[in-house]
Amino acid sequence: SAVTEEWIKYFRAADAGCVAISAKQKGGANAVKAAIEKELAGLLERRQNRGMGGAKTQVMLCGIPNVGKSTFINTFAGSARAKAADRPGVTKGKQWVSTDKFDLLDMPGVLWKKFDSKTIASNLAFIGSIKDDILDVEELAMNLLDEVRRNYPDLVAQRYKLDAETLALPPYELMEAIGRKRGLLVRGGEVNTERCAIMLVDEFRACKWGRISL
């Protein structure tokens, strides 16, 4: 997406290598391997000249929680070697995974001690990097809808079969409209907004809305 391209430009402008991938797809792992070998071409050549061509390259996987670090390692290694799940905090400590050419160090996700930006805090909550049990799920879902419809209105409209008028409703009313369409009702015909909020967040994180970069 255009947002992803902006992130790539941002990192490359800072002279940092950047590859946009899916952690679940082998092609993404191969792209990272190629990027590592390109970055370390001089070192690998010196190793080869010194008779150390068989030495493995050590790679550390670090980042915020629940972004697919362990999933990526399993794809990179070609088998389920690191424990992975769709929630933050699964990786409790350092774990090494060895492949033919690489030794991969899987690290627990880390966050800032304090968020100076509400946008950063919201985006981390949207993708599940902050534990849901400390969040108000309805507020989370409303903020998510409001954010995504601003940059990806067509994806939200297509997923929940919304017309332009409904898509433009205030966030709470929009969530109610989606819940009504999905039949998430309680006795008396009112929308179960908590169930609807959970459904919205779960579907977003499962990529059922489509490819989205925040």
Residue ranges of predicted features:
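Short, solvent-exposed amphipathic alpha-helical segments in soluble enzyme
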Residues: 8-9, 77, 121
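Helix-rich effector regions associated with P-loop NTPase G domains
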Residues: 16-17, 85-214
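Solvent-exposed alpha-helices and their adjacent loops that cap or buttress functional pockets
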Residues: 52-54, 76, 97
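Alpha-helical scaffold segments in soluble metabolic enzymes
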Residues: 31, 35, 71, 143, ...
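Conserved protein kinase catalytic core
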Residues: 1, 28, 80, 112-115
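Canonical P-loop GTPase G-domain recognition
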Residues: 1-63, 182-185
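Glycine-rich phosphate-binding P-loop
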Residues: 58-78, 82, 107
